[in-house]
């Protein structure tokens, strides 16, 4: 978990979110962003998908956590940014978004969470 002060506000980012919807509600009530890695694509990730389902569109982030937490199509292999589209597509499908909407929403969220371009 990461928290930092920006413009007199505290930004909370739950990295590699791997908990259930109950904890997600608590985090979201405090303004947290939930960041999902490739593990959300695993068959066993039901609780993570429940958390994704309740998160507001503008509080969802995506990450690789490379070289670990590789998405399902390549599970067990070395992870990297080149596999991020698998996770983005999975999140898009879960949210009912097309790929363009997912890319735009997740990009906008990253700018909001991290304060703009790096």
Say what each PLM segment does.
Residues 1-12:
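Single conserved hydrophobic/aromatic residue that forms the stacking wall/gate
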Residues 9, 23-37, 56-59:
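Glycine-enriched alpha-helix->loop->beta-strand junction motifs that scaffold or abut catalytic
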Residues 13-15, 35, 61-63:
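Structural detector of well-ordered beta-strand residues that form the stable sheet scaffold
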Residues 15, 27, 52, 65, ...:
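Conserved, mostly hydrophobic/aromatic
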Residues 16, 32, 39-40, 66-67:
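Active-site metal-binding loops of divalent metal-dependent hydrolases
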Residues 35-50:
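Active-site glycine- and acidic-residue-rich loops that bind
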Residues 58-80:
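Short acidic/histidine-rich active-site segments
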Residues 82-118:
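Mid-to-C-terminal alpha-helical segments outside catalytic/metal-binding sites
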């Amino acid at each position: 978990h990461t928290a930092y002060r920006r413009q007199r506000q505290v930004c909370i980012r739950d990295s590699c979110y791997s908990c259930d919807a109950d904890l997600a509600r608590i985090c979201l009530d405090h303004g947290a962003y939930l960041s999902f890695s490739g593990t959300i694509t695993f068959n066993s990730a039901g609780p993570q998908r429940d958390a994704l389902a309740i998160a507001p569109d503008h509080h969802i982030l995506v990450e690789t956590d490379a070289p670990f937490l590789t998405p399902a199509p390549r599970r067990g292999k070395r992870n990297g940014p080149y596999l991020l589209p698998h996770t983005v597509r999975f999140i898009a499908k879960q949210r009912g978004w097309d790929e363009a909407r997912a890319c735009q929403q997740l990009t906008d969220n990253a700018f909001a969470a991290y304060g703009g371009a790096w």
